[in-house]
A protein has these predicted regions:
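Extracytoplasmic gate region of multi-pass secondary transporters
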Residues: 35-36, 216-267, 355-359
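Helix-breaking motifs and short loop linkers at transmembrane-helix boundaries and internal kinks
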Residues: 47, 79, 100-106, 134, ...
Length: 409
């Protein structure tokens, strides 16, 4: 009820900014997670090992900070709205180009470029949203906005279930051009950030490093926090379909269904903990959500039946995406005004860079245990859940800060 009341209180302009950012992140994640469902098919087509194709995930994640910096600085200088449109169009074009890659080398190059484009969307979209909405709505909106990622994974699961056997992996990537249509919606209905319009962009003419003076300690903390968070999400999601196929030998329909169940849990967790963070505070909500992963871990990784695995997936993603649902508002509140188009996205994506080895590491470790993916998935998830609890406990927050004020400078 709290979430609905906050959404109803938004003006049409505020809702449009939120919807555009949510859909942008949803479709961004949709394009990214098509890889998770097609690793085996791509490897077979290119006649290489799955570990070689899995490097495309690592490469995409590693390139995202480049996009976060480039598009973030452009958004700080020229506005959130136009740069968001260019960025969405670019990652849609690169997704469809991936469908026509003639070999693994070209495919990897295109996935790296896709990572640059993907890296720009989250930071720009979140800054546009949180600079547009009232302070009281930040927690509720944050939980929904971040779960655009889970919705994208869910959408990829449905497309995999419905179309993969018919159109193959190349056809799946062609479907990934759909995000380009969102540009039309943004062009027609979305307004520029009021904070940016009030003149905050003038500060962005400063060199980024000059604007960050006095904030480097904060930046270092956030990068470490986001590294742990990215291990948390990618460690439970990227190779989960491969875990179901290889370790449990489930068919495509069962894999899709269990992935869908997990993503429903992710949406529930993100919305629930995002809203609760308005009452509990950002750090306490992150701690509670992360701790939930520990008792769920044995069920999620080591259950043997589809029903129990589905229950484990649902509960695990409530935990993982419950913690993640707080991140958009948390990072935007911590960000200095002059670099809000850059700071949240860059910190997030630098965390992605340092966590980019996750997929390659988990595949490598699974091969050491006769392709038993349960062990690497459980190991990564358990360790990083504890690390996140510690980092949140010793960290800072600025819940309720007024953007454009001296406190937010």
């Amino acid at each position: 009820m709290l979430v609905l009341s906050e959404l109803k209180g938004l003006t049409s302009g505020q809702r449009n900014a939120f919807v555009a950012s949510f859909l942008g992140w949803t479709l961004d994640a949709f394009d990214f997670f098509l890889m998770s469902f097609t690793l085996g098919a791509i490897a077979k087509d290119f006649q290489v090992e799955v570990t070689e194709v899995a490097f495309a995930i690592t490469l995409t994640l590693a390139c995202r900070p480049v996009g976060a910096f480039i598009f973030g600085r452009l958004a700080d200088r020229f506005g959130r709205r136009p740069v968001l449109m260019v960025d969405i169009l670019l990652f849609a074009v690169l997704e469809i180009a991936s469908a026509f890659a003639p070999n693994l080398t070209i495919f990897l190059v295109l996935r790296g470029l896709f990572g640059i484009a993907m890296g720009g969307e989250w930071g720009i979209g979140s800054s546009l949203t949180f600079e547009s909405i009232p302070e009281r709505a930040r927690g509720a909106v944050s939980g929904i906005l971040q779960e655009g990622y889970a919705c994208g994974f869910l959408l990829a699961s449905v497309v995999n279930w419905a179309l993969f056997e018919v159109i193959g992996w190349r056809g799946m990537f062609i479907v990934g051009v759909v995000p380009a249509l969102l540009v039309i919606y943004i062009r027609m209905f979305v307004e520029e950030s009021p904070v940016w319009q009030k003149g905050e962009h003038a500060k962005a003419k400063l060199n980024f490093f000059a604007a960050m003076r006095g904030h480097w300690k904060l930046a270092a903390y956030v990068i470490v926090l986001m590294t742990a968070f990215n291990f948390f999400s990618h460690g439970t999601q990227d190779l989960y379909p491969q875990f179901l196929r290889t370790t449990h030998h489930f068919d495509n329909g069962t894999v899709s269904l269990l992935t869908i169940v997990g993503n429903v849990g992710a949406i529930v967790g993100g919305v629930m903990f995002g809203a609760w963070s308005e009452r509990l505070g950002r750090r306490k909500a992150i701690i509670f959500a992360s701790l939930l992963a520990l008792p769920v871990l044995p069920l999620w990784a080591f259950a043997q039946t589809p029903i129990l695995l589905g229950l484990g997936a649902f509960l695990m993603q409530i935990s993982v995406q419950g913690a993640w649902g707080i991140i958009p508002t948390h990072l935007n509140e911590l960000s200095p005004d002059a670099v809000r188009g850059t700071f949240p996205g860059l910190m997030y994506q630098l965390g992605n860079l340092f966590a980019a080895v996750n997929a390659t590491f988990q595949v490598w470790l699974a091969t050491r245990y006769d392709d038993n993916y349960a062990i690497p998935l459980a190991l990564v998830t358990g360790v990083v859940a504890i690390v996140i609890v510690i980092l949140a406990a010793v960290g800072v927050e600025k819940k309720g800060v007024v953007f454009g004020s001296t406190e937010s400078a």
